[in-house]
Amino acid sequence: MTDSERDKLDKLDILAKRQDAVISIGIGGSYLGNQALFDIFCGSYWNHFSSEERKGYPLIYFVGQNADSASITDLIKQLRRNFYQKKRKLKVLLLLISKSGSTMEPMLAFQILSRNLIDFCELSVVAITNQNKGQIHELAEKNQWTCFNMPEGIGGRFSIFSQVGLVFSKFIGLDIKKFLSGAKMVEESCWSEKWSENPALAMAAIKFIAMKEYGVSAEVIMPYGDKFRAVGWWYAQLLGESLGKKLDIHGNIVHNGRIPVSCVGTTDMHSLTQEHQQGRKNKLLQFISAQEQNKDMDVVCEESGKQGVIKLSKVLSAALHANEKALADDGRMSCHVSMRTVTPFHVGALMYFFFLSTAYEGAMAGINSYDQPGVEDYKKILHSYLSECIEKV
């Protein structure tokens, strides 16, 4: 990041608190990491809190992650309702994120919002895109938007520590220095070539051997706690796009990869665990948890004739460990990555740990973990289908 961009980033603190709402527009890696950060540090009810409870930070919405007219229509209705309640134009910032500047879903969402919000909103735009080319770059120059560069060589699924994640973090008050310091700690701790001294390498080796020697063809990502649900979505993209490759680096057909399946504990212990526990032994479960919860409460519990008070977080933790043991007792594989507590530092460390482990496994498999040629196949077909549907204006 250049000094100029750092200056612009610092100014976002003030800009954020001048907004009624920020709408993050992106898909894939331009969406999933930010959704994960929002869920962890803001929670499901952020937009129901008062401005004081949000410490002056704006309402946050996500669009452009699907070509779904229903959800974007509902967002417009909600903002219009806020306009009537406040009896003034809303200050709304559109955070437009697309490396190519031509990604279909975000660009269509931006088009719809720009057209439909202008009557009752004061719109401003912050863009994150390629600084030298693309539709968004051209629009940013023409309209004098604040624009951040999406660096070359960083794929969307690896972009949470780049401008993509850092700019978004400013709008929710996340301490980005602590977030980056957590990533740096992992980077400095996980470079040994000895797996016994490098936990990211050790996990990569375990999963690689499980896949190649034990027939593991699926990885179930199972974080415990609602706030980590989107971490599962984020890691599923990282795993699928990085390791799911037809060719190795020498051009040989290998069809590498595991099917990523995202679920959440304890919710899915009451549905999917039946298959995990008694279905085919072709799965490895990846558990994610936090040892300490920032918010907790006491509940009365009775087990085995013993009644007393227990922390709800202890129930969550006990359920996870019971799941682990039941799987192990039946010879089924799992890994568990646990944070001590939920802070920007620890979340930064967690996400970078998965980056490194995935990269190490890609190297073991002899594949390129940093491209995604498979997604181009459907795009070519989709463009031809859409061209047949376009009606002349």
Please tell me what each predicted stretch does.
Residues 1-16, 301-306, 322:
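Extended, charge-enriched "interface" segments that sit outside catalytic cores
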Residues 8-20, 76-91, 205-217, 276-281:
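Glycine-rich phosphate/diphosphate-binding loops that line cofactor/substrate pockets in enzymes
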